[in-house]
């Protein structure tokens, strides 16, 4: 492959650290768990100061108060009698309805089905798929009615054990897992290549670039640096916790800077779809005052392109849609058609095509000269 390519992308590199596994009997990702992982024992959970019944909190249940609210809807009038058993202060979901796929099979589309699908998620812990005596905190369980029924002390304890599990406990374990697998990928392309003049990667002829977006474990950065794999840096998907927009000028050298991936709306479409976000971007990322323009004008798009070109990232790879966006005459009149892939829509296919012909592009000397000038001004053009 190194005869044809100077670089390759490792898609969803986080899967080499761990994957999110959703049981076959369920539909919602909230009921999944990381594999591999280091789940808790009951004793470890109680060591955090959590006093609840861990095994009981693996079974979907709601309080009498929650049940009363659910049954206020006339379509749910028989909810308690038909689908729950009373256990002290709790209404516990009957075993036949603890599978989301079973619910979809047994109940027609409607309010009751929707309610039961939601109630199945009313757990604080999920048993490990392999070792039933071990437990994973349900991700985001703080948004359940069940969490709201805990004492203040148990809420604090659960928050601690939840965050420790997802952000600390597994970090080194996941790093070790990745080191068993990722080197096999990078070393498989081992060959001498002129790209090594720019990128001395222990003889590897192709430059590995990771797609490391999403819920990124803290250990990913150190593993990628150790293996000299470029990270992917996107301004509106910063990796720093609590930061709304990153600053491309802060990107690490071993990275690829881009405005959007093929799974994201290009800048113009994102601006159009996210009025509140684009307003914040106008102030926080571009440092302008006043009201943001209703659409991403050519001037705005050029400003964002320049910012990425000027980043310290080794590579700046921008989508063609974002390049064309800097031209008032060549940009598409229909930005809603420019997103290549919409992951949430299974019926949307990779149908994007450039709206210009190659002949038209060749003749657009003003645009071509401008692109070259922008790249040259950033120091990325080897004259």
PLM region spans:
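Catalytic cores of glycan-processing enzymes that make or break glycosidic bonds
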Residues: 1-383
């Amino acid at each position: 492959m190194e005869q044809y390519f100077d670089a390759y992308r490792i898609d969803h590199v986080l899967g080499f650290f761990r994957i999110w596994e959703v049981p076959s009997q369920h539909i919602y990702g909230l009921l999944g768990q990381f594999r591999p992982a280091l789940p808790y024992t009951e004793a470890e959970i109680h060591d955090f100061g959590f006093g609840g019944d861990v095994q009981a909190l693996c079974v979907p249940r709601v309080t009498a108060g929650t049940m009363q609210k659910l049954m206020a809807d006339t379509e749910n009038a028989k909810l308690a009698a038909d689908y729950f058993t009373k256990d002290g202060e709790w209404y516990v979901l009957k075993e036949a309805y603890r599978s989301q796929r079973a619910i979809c099979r047994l109940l027609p589309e409607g309010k009751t089905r929707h309610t039961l699908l939601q109630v199945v998620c009313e757990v604080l812990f999920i048993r490990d798929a392999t070792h039933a005596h071990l437990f994973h905190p349900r991700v985001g369980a703080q948004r359940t009615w069940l969490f709201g029924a805990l004492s203040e002390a148990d809420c604090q304890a659960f928050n601690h054990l939840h965050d420790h599990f997802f952000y600390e406990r597994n970090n080194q374990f996941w790093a070790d897992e990745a080191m068993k697998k990722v080197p096999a990928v990078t070393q498989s392309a081992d060959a001498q290549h002129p790209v090594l003049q720019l990128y001395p990667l222990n003889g590897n002829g192709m430059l590995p670039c990771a797609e490391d977006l999403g819920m990124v474990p803290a250990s990913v950065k150190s593993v990628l640096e150790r293996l000299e794999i470029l990270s992917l840096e996107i301004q509106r998907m910063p990796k720093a916790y609590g930061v709304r927009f990153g600053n491309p000028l802060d990107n690490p050298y071993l990275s690829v800077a881009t405005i959007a991936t093929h799974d994201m709306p290009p800048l113009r479409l994102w601006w159009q779809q996210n009025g509140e976000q684009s307003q914040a971007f106008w102030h926080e990322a571009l440092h302008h005052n006043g009201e943001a323009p209703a659409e991403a004008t050519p001037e705005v798009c050029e400003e964002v392109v320049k910012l990425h070109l000027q980043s310290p990232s080794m590579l700046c790879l921008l989508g063609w849609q974002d390049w064309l966006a800097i031209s008032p005459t060549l940009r598409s009149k229909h930005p809603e058609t420019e997103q290549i892939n919409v992951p949430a829509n299974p019926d949307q296919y990779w149908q994007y095509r450039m709206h210009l012909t190659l002949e038209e592009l060749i003749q657009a000397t003003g645009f071509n000269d401008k692109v070259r000038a922008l790249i040259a001004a950033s120091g990325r053009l080897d004259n």
